Amino acid sequence: STLMRSSAASDVYKRQKKYNTNCTFHVNPFDAYMDSPMWDMYVKKDLLCRNADGSLVKGDVWWNRQSYFVNMVNEWNAGVTKQRIDAFIEQVPLVKETGVLYFDNETQYPPSLYHYVTKEDQISAIKKAAEYLKTEYGIQLIGEYADTNLYGVCSLGVTWDWWASLNINQMEVAPYIACGGRDGTHDELYGGQIDLTKRRFQVFGASVQLEDTQFQRDPFKVARELSHHTYVYFYLNRLLRLKYETRDTLGITLTLSDNVVSKWDNDNVHRLYRDGYLMKEGHDVFVPVFWVNHLEIMAYSVKGRTGIWHFPREWTGIEKVDIYTFNEDFTGLRLLEQGRKINKNQIYLSQEPDRAQIIVPAGTDMTDRSTIYSNPPSGTATFICKDVETHGNWKRKYGKKGYDIFGHSSKLPKTCMLSYIGDSLKVLDNNSTRPVSLQKVEGKGRIEAVRTSVLHQLIDVTVEENTKVSLYFADYKEKNCQEVVDVIDVNTKRMLASYLLNNFEEGVYLSFGVSGNVQFRITRFFYDHYGNPDYPVCSAIFFDKE
């Protein structure tokens, strides 16, 4: 159901470009209402949840209308789910441009006792709908709540209360699989009290809830929330999480890649540092806007601030900057100062309360709306095959152009560059005799070693055109390792290929056709209701002609 006409939705999508943004569309496939034109069909085909006595299962009353629950299993089996998806995409084709569809209130799938349909059956039907969206239209399902049963099926990158509903340790879930924002109950800027039990929201990055009546009449609040929460949330959740520590009563320290540290100090203030320089203190921020195709800083202070901010290392050598703010109706920028000199990669700023300042190198064309996603790709990658037959006996099949057998020997092609980010090397057995263990380069010995991390790690590879790159994975300790292997374009951050791995106690090779510079991202992943697998592992990388 939806309260927006298709014509209105299309108008919103057309206007989004004016504001340099993309809109997502929210639908609720779980609720049914008697005033819907589809009501009679759903009753006739028996597509609604029923109690054991045959009566309809009621939901809440929304906008003075009684809701009822859709039997997702019967709907799918009747072919109606696909029909609804097809009709919706035809009605609002611009959803394909955004690439995501948001299921509202994704917790409402009760059992239908009359039909002997369990809640687990309902969840399976949702997974089928998600798979259909992905395979048929290339659209990723996203959702309002984090449900462990849908982990990995429904992407949760914008889930506003993901920590509360998933109730897990953030160090166990990568931000590109699940992260999110907050509600208004723990932030004094919403008029509420800070809930110290939720301070991790800001340490890990919390976005903004733009629902209901919070901001509808005051766009300045939107600018405020985006500046000191969403920009930081976006910045933090593109980094690798390396270490999480607590201390004393309030202290939290999160160490991330790129020499970034996010801290909640004992003075009850959140601070963010990169290379030891302050980027955020409370509600004052000086953070990079990294998705645009030029250097840019967003500076903002809720109550006003005067002092020195240090530019990121990428700004070294820049001598002058231009400073902008938003115009009155937030449709563009207004120049505040042109050609301000800076010294020693730092700037003295006098920040007015509640006014964003956008700082760029002098002469930057601010009408250029290109982003990093419009950059030329750094490389290409396609999945070739999965090999579960070779085990550790790689010599006759892999590594003709080069290899790196972790903890043992490395011989790289002359044109290859290889580096590892966010992991550590562990040699488990240097004298193994098991077939799953990798053969040593010389002799008959075998080795069991892995590069591993608590959550995720990167292998950065640059190769010449048409190179076959194969990674070897083995769950040597048989600890239920489950991981997802993504291949990422370094320039645009787009995903080029992806593969889910589990049950690889006997060893498995994943081979990809690669050209240029790509990153293999290996992430701890969960199947079967958050089954607590062991840490991600990788044991070798091989190079051959494609």
Language-model features: where?
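Compositionally biased, intrinsically disordered or flexible polar/acidic segments
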Residues: 375-546
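Hydrophobic beta-strand scaffold residues
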Residues: 16, 23, 140-141
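Active-site-proximal substrate-binding groove within the catalytic cores of carbohydrate-active enzymes
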Residues: 73-99, 105-374
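Single conserved hydrophobic/aromatic residue that forms the stacking wall/gate
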Residues: 2-9, 13
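Short acidic-hydrophobic catalytic motif
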Residues: 1, 34-38, 432
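Active-site-adjacent "subsite" loops/lids of carbohydrate-active enzymes
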Residues: 29-91
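Acidic (Asp/Glu)-rich catalytic clusters
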Residues: 14-20, 93
